[in-house]
């Protein structure tokens, strides 16, 4: 099953077009590497996938649920309730400065699954321990 699908994604910052017609599919359980030089749009692509950055154009779907569709040349986002449900299953781990500095590594890993997904604390901590 396709976990993440992005089609014809576009993103600009002013006159600088950072993402130009990017399309990709990630199957559930698949590992994907996004490689490129500094400033090539890797982080912007991930931020668009996580809906932390708005796309200027393109489609975005998770497990077949449309988060963003292209209409009349513009990206149109699904209703907030649909987006919240999708975001419960997709997240990012940021490098250094995006972590909560007053949390230890364990708390940074466990906070979202416990509070956003309402998962059992002991279960989440056991999974985090295994990952670390």
Annotate each PLM feature.
Residues 50:
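Helix-to-loop junction immediately C-terminal to a conserved catalytic motif
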Residues 16-17, 84:
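Short coil-to-beta microelement around the adenine-binding A-loop and adjacent beta1/P-loop entry
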Residues 35-37:
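The feature captures the beta-strand-to-loop junction immediately N-terminal to the Walker
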Residues 103-111:
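Short coil-to-helix segment of the ABC ATPase nucleotide-binding domain corresponding to the Q-loop/switch region
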Residues 122-132:
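ABC ATPase nucleotide-binding domain helical subdomain, centered on the C-loop/LSGGQ "ABC signature"
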Residues 67-91, 121-122:
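ABC ATPase NBD coupling module
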Residues 58-72, 127:
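Conserved ABC transporter NBD signature motif
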């Amino acid at each position: 099953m396709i976990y993440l699908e992005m089609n014809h994604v576009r993103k600009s910052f002013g006159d600088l077009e950072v993402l130009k017609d990017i399309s990709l599919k990630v199957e559930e359980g698949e590992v994907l590497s996004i490689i490129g030089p500094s400033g090539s749009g890797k982080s912007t692509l991930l931020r668009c996938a996580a809906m932390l950055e708005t796309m200027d154009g393109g489609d975005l779907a998770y497990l077949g649920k449309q988060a963003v569709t292209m209409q009349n040349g513009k990206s149109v986002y699904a209703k907030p309730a649909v987006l919240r449900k999708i975001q419960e299953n997709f997240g990012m781990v940021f490098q250094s400065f995006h972590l909560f500095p007053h949390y230890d590594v364990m708390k940074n890993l466990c906070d979202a699954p416990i509070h956003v997904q309402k998962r059992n604390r002991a279960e989440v901590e056991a999974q985090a321990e295994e990952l670390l």
